[in-house]
Amino acid sequence: MESTLSAGIIMAEALQNRLPGLENMWLWVTFLGDPKNLFQFCFPAAYYASRRLGISVLWITFIAEWLNLVFKWFLFGDRPFWWVHESGYSTQTPIQIHQFPSSCETGPGSPSGHCMITGAALWPVMTAISSQVASRSRSPWVRVIPGLAYCTFLLAVGLSRVFLLAHFPHQVLGGLIVGAALGWLMSPRVPMERELSFYGLTALALMLGASLMYWTLFTLGLDLSWSINLASKWCERPEWVHMDSRPFASLSRDSGSALGLGIALHTPCYAQIRRAHLGNGQKIACFVLAMGLLVFLEWLGYPPQISLFYIFNFLKYTLWPCLVLALVPWVVHTLSDQEAPPIRSS
C-alpha cells in the first residue's frame, strides 16, 4: 500500500510541476465537480429542462453523497496533503508539491466524493442527452459524444483531485467506478411525487442511520474525528479548513434536501404549476431567479458555532428544493400570466 500511495504523490508532483500552465484549469474543474454544485446549479438547470430529470439529479445526489460518507467512515482513506507528512515521506524523499485552498478537506479520502457523487448524479443527464441525440442523428460517432463527454469530464475531475493533493489515484478510480455504477442502478428507480411521509422518513433514515453508525463506531473505540484533526494539523493555512467539508455538513445537506423535496412536491404552488408547460424563456427566467435567490442565501453566510452551522445548513437545503420546484416556477408563471396547457410529460 505504501508504494501505491507513494506513486500517487509522484503523480501529483508531476501534474503540479510539469504542467504548470494548467493550474487554473484544474482549480476550475474541481470547482465544477464539487458535489455542492450539483445541489446548487446542476439540479435547478436539470429541473427546468425536464421535471423528471431534475428530481432524478437531486435524489441521486443526496443518496450518493450519503453513501460516500458511509464508505469513507469504513475505508479510512488518507489524503495526500497530510499523508506526505504523517508518513515521513516528505523528509525521506525530496518533493516539490504545494497545497491549495481546495486541498484541505476534513473527511477521509476514500473514495473520492467529487468523482463518486458527480459520476452518479450526472449519469441521468448523460443518458437523457444521449436519448435526444440518438433520436435526431443516425451517426454512431455523434451518438457517442454525450458518453464521451461524461467520461472526459469525470476523468478531468479525478486528475484535478490528484493535482490538489485531495485524493490518491486509487481513491479517484474507486469513486469513478462506484459513482457510474450507482448512477446506472438508481436512474430507473428514482421515486417521483410520492407522499410527504415517504420523503420525511427518507430524511429521518439518512440522519438516524448515519448517526447510529457514527456512535456505534465511536463506542467500539474508533475515533472518526481523526481526519479532521489531521487536516487541521497539516493544512498550510487555517482558513483553508472549511466547516462545510466536515462529514456531518454533508449529512445535514442530504437529509435537508430529502425533506425539502417532499415539502416542495406537496406545496400549493407546485400543485398549481405542475400542470403548466413553461416556455423556454420562462425556464431561463426560472433559472436566473433561482440563482439570484442562491446568491442571497450564500450572502447570509453561516454561524461560526458548529452545531448552529449544521442546523442552518439543514434548513438551507430544506428550503432550496422548495424554491426551485415550487416558488420560483409559480412566480414566473404567475407574472407571465399565461394559461396553462394540458400536462406534458417530461
Curated annotation (Swiss-Prot):
Topological domains annotated Cytoplasmic: 46-56, 130-138, 187-197, 274-283, 329-346
CDD domains per UniProt: PAP2_glucose_6_phosphatase
InterPro entries: Glucose-6-phosphatase, P_Acid_Pase_2/haloperoxi_sf, P_Acid_Pase_2/haloperoxidase
Active site: residue positions: 114 (proton donor), 167 (nucleophile)
One Gene Ontology cellular component: endoplasmic reticulum
Pathway(s) per entry: Carbohydrate biosynthesis; gluconeogenesis
Biological processes annotated in GO: gluconeogenesis; glucose 6-phosphate metabolic process; glucose-6-phosphate transport
Pfam families associated with the record: PAP2
Disrupted-gene phenotype: Mice display reduced glucose-6-phosphate hydrolytic activity in the brain. No phenotypic difference was noted at birth but 4 months old female mice display growth retardation. Mutant mice exhibit a decreased plasma cholesterol concentration and an increased plasma glucagon concentration but no difference in blood glucose concentration. Mice display neutropenia and neutrophil dysfunctions.
Function: Hydrolyzes glucose-6-phosphate to glucose in the endoplasmic reticulum. May form with the glucose-6-phosphate transporter (SLC37A4/G6PT) a ubiquitously expressed complex responsible for glucose production through glycogenolysis and gluconeogenesis. Probably required for normal neutrophil function.
Similarity remark: Belongs to the glucose-6-phosphatase family.
Name the record gives this protein: Glucose-6-phosphatase 3
Gene: G6pc3
